[in-house]
Amino acid sequence: HKEYRRQRQMCIRDSTNNDYGKGLADVYVAAVKAHGISVTTVTAHEEGKGDYGAEVATLASAGGDALAVLGYLDQAGGSIIEGSLDSGSFDTFVLSDGMIGDSLTDRFGKDLNKSFGSLPGSTGKGAGKFAEVAKAGGIDSSGPYTGESYDAAALITLAMQAGGKGDRATIQANVMDVANAPGKKIYPGAVS
């Protein structure tokens, strides 16, 4: 994203104070540094607090052109954005997938015009085929994990076909065989 490349310094406010949040923050730090952007601080937060003013003040004192908020939209992440906007600490936010949703723009509107985020997914042949199949079925394929959910359902279906039954044990016994080589690539829309 072009805005990402314009940043010189970035604060990273990681997801909840747990192993997932730490791992996600580590990935973001590596990506930011790979683009020549310095990281001014990386801090974790606890979910469920009523006020994140102290956390926002800590982030503001570290400085930066943008604040990466790697949290959950309707929990602490949204409150940290709100506190940052209210205090004038940051006006550009880099958002992880857990921070992206309609309630974000409903809550902050144009205040997020400089902000951007990332969603998991791929851009290969399978992604294009899935977008076509989803559109034909009236499904919005742009949401997080939509394509991956389709893939998971297809693997479960193929594992049941391979084992001849639809029970848990059959799926477990066959899923790795249908998901890995040798085999035939099956693209979205071809599972029946």
Identify the role of each PLM range.
Residues 5-9, 13-192:
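Extracytosolic ligand-binding ectodomains
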